[in-house]
């Protein structure tokens, strides 16, 4: 029996660029040994045809849909991401087209939960150990930016209860994880650890480049 992996994370502006680089495979020398570069061209985004500027799209959505004219706090959560997957055996029993349908149905459900206009990207990675989707969105609710209001305990319970049933009704043999269980899916933990490492590494690279630019400016 296969269980649905559906894990939400919240991010501030400082983390978004690193997530963009990870999701869109913009690193020439990728440090993640689980990434098979030969299969990277098989990755796809269900929202965007080409790579995008995450922060630019996020800023545009906030400006267009947020009622308040006050500046967004630097420590505000501006981007949320949902990782959707299952175990390797689940995907091995699906054709490529059925795998895509699995992610499309999951995307459609999340669109209804967070608002289609708030979706940034839905990147499916097929070049790692297990197929999975990084579904990113701006936490806008009632014309305000608030991840706390949107992604609360009730929201998470509804997703965990409803999404597996939606997928089962579409013909996918998948179940909800055990309610109240302290055991977390290995895949989710691995995704989170790898992503956090990539974000920290990219932030260090940005700091190094900034310091070099400042040094060069002082010399000229």
Predicted feature locations:
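N-terminal nicking endonuclease/strand-transfer module with a His-rich metal-binding environment
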Residues: 1-219
């Amino acid at each position: 029996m296969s269980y649905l992996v559906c894990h939400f994370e919240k991010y501030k502006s400082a983390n978004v660029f690193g997530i963009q680089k990870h999701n869109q495979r913009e690193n020439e020398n990728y440090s993640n040994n689980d990434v098979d570069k030969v299969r990277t061209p098989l990755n796809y985004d269900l929202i965007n045809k080409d790579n995008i500027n995450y922060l630019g799209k996020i800023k545009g959505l906030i400006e267009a849909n947020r009622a308040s004219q006050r500046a967004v706090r630097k420590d505000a959560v501006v981007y949320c991401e949902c990782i959707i997957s299952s175990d390797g055996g689940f995907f091995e029993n699906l054709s490529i087209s059925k795998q895509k349908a699995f992610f499309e149905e999951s995307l459609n459900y999340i669109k209804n939960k967070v608002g289609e206009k708030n979706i940034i990207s839905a990147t499916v990675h097929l070049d790692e150990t297990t197929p999975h989707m990084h579904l990113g969105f701006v936490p806008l609710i009632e014309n305000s930016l608030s991840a706390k209001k949107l992604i609360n305990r009730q929201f998470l319970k509804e997703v965990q209860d409803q999404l597996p049933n939606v997928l089962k009704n579409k013909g996918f043999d998948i179940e909800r994880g055990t309610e109240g269980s302290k055991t977390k899916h290995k895949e989710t933990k691995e995704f989170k650890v790898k992503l956090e490492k990539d974000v920290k590494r990219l932030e260090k690279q940005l700091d190094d480049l900034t310091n070099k630019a400042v040094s060069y400016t002082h010399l000229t």
